[in-house]
């Protein structure tokens, strides 16, 4: 979401499912609600085939503003993905899910944010549950332009758990 006093320069959209995929994979593969501290994902390797699978999801065909959430990346979609890539180590599935989040943010910026705004931006404020996963934050930082530091919305006094309210207010206003 880009906030600006000039409403014509303000826009908002989802960059993808963020931690929906990794949390559900943790539940199915490891019997855990989420990957605490991103430790499991950090022990895996990113798989190109699985990454391509995620990046070819129909979500990417929709124009912004768009929202990507549990209807797009449903339990059925994630179960089918796990089955399709069952030959991969479980840790690699999770590592790729986290890397996909970083790739999704970078792709969304490149495709939808004017280049001059990207070049003049020095911080990306992340919010939501994904900010609690250091591996997701690392993957985002690795993929966004070097001039941008990825941090959480807490740095500017907005609790990360208020993501949904902020997201939909920005999308509605833009």
Task: Show the residue positions of the predicted features.
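Glycine-rich phosphate-binding loop of actin/hexokinase-like ATP-binding domains
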Residues: 1-40
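A short glycine/serine-rich beta->alpha loop
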Residues: 9-12, 88-92, 153-160
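Thr-Gly-centered strand-to-loop micro-motif
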Residues: 12, 37, 126-127, 152-153
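Buried hydrophobic packing segments
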Residues: 21-25, 81, 105, 109, ...
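Glycine-rich phosphate-binding/hydrolytic loop that grips phosphoryl groups
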Residues: 26, 95, 99, 151-174
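A contiguous, well-structured pocket-lining segment that forms one wall/lid of small-molecule binding clefts
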Residues: 32-33, 38-123, 134-148
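Glycine-rich beta-strand-to-loop/alpha-helix junction loops that act as flexible
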Residues: 123-133, 165
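Flexible loop/turn segments at secondary-structure boundaries
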Residues: 132-135, 158-159
């Amino acid at each position: 979401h880009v906030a600006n006093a000039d409403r014509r320069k303000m826009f908002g959209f989802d960059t993808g499912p963020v931690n929906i995929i990794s949390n559900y994979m943790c539940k199915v593969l490891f019997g855990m609600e989420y990957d605490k501290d991103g430790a499991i994902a950090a022990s895996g390797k990113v798989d190109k085939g699985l990454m391509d699978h995620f990046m070819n999801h129909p979500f990417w065909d929709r124009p912004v503003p768009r929202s990507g959430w549990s209807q797009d990346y449903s339990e059925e979609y994630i179960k089918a993905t796990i089955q399709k890539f069952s030959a991969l180590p479980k840790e690699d599935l999770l590592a790729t899910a986290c890397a996909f989040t970083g790739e999704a943010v970078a792709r969304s910026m490149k495709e939808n944010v004017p280049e001059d705004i990207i070049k003049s931006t020095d911080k990306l404020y992340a919010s939501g549950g994904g900010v609690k996963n250091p591996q997701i934050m690392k993957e985002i930082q690795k993929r966004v332009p070097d001039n941008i530091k990825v941090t959480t919305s807490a740095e500017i006094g907005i609790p990360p758990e208020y993501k949904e309210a902020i997201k939909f207010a920005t999308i509605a206003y833009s």
